Amino acid sequence: MVELRDLPELHVIGWTNVNASGEPYPNLWEFVFGELDIDAKFDSITSKVQDSGCYLGLFQNRTSVPRLWEQAAWDHEFLLAVEVKQLDFIPEGLVQKTFPASTYAIFTANGVPHSAFQNTWNHIHNEWLPHSEYKFNPDGVFFIQYTEKSGPNDERFEAHLCVPIVKK
């Protein structure tokens, strides 16, 4: 099932997956929840919209939905962020970004993350987009809205894949 929704401009504060040398972190999630301690950084942002532990994974400058089960998808302009009401306090090591308003097709991925992402991607690319009146909007930003059920390797995993769209 898909939900179509017009979303307003999106203001976020987040962390970009590049180290000091400009290379992506090879152990992304270990670094984020270990050394970086992203939970503490995000919890210090008083203007955030999401609950603690609920994040946005934004994939910038894409022309289609990335293959999320492949590491390369996370290596290129990936931003782990929280939506904020205002861009006031930005913790050290984080950046602020604003993305334009867009219409989105929102799909829910359920199950163990690897297969949930793959199954949802297959549905989007092989069934929904070809048979809908929409196409991917490269002027928007594809993002994952992680929920409180978004633990790694957890069969109860749930996340929303938000695909920017325009009429064909």
Task: Indicate residue ranges for each PLM-predicted region.
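A solvent-exposed interaction/effector surface
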Residues: 1-168
